[in-house]
Amino acid sequence: MPRLALASVILFLGFAGGYWFQRPAGGGDVAALTEEVSELKEMMMLSLLEKESATDRLRAVSLTSELGKASDKVTTALFSTLNNDPNVNVRLAALEALIPFTSDSKVREGLVRSIAFQDSPLVQVNLAELMAAMQEKKSVSELKKLAESDRTPKEVKEKIKKSIEVLI
């Protein structure tokens, strides 16, 4: 019986010691694993953006919300999608995905440049409203060009002019 008690105490001390000595190292492992998962999500997002299916591209854009912060690669891919994707829903999703990063001046400048690329009334109106919400005065000249274009629908012109009024 004393041997069993001694073995139990040694076993308990072994587990307690192992737990005690492994704790600090475990935090570093978790941080490294979190970083790897983030990198994998970024790679998956970039890969999905190149797919033909609009559903895959929408899934890729939605993955950005799971990334802690966006790298230059991610924001560049989102701008490419916003400016060039044939599907309006994917472009709108890319615009929405960029909103959390508007504190970055590069993102704000990219959004202003994107105004000239848009032919969809939905994207045009959303960009104009975003510019007004951000108080991005640098966008006024691009918005005026859009409002004066013959290709811009009348209702869209009215909304863009309201956004310009907010900015001026």
Language model segments and positions:
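Eukaryotic acidic, Ser/Thr-rich intrinsically disordered low-complexity regions
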Residues: E148-I168
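Alpha-solenoid repeat junctions
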Residues: T64-G68, L98, T102, M131, ...
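Single-pass transmembrane signal-anchor helices and their membrane-water interface zones
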Residues: M1-G27
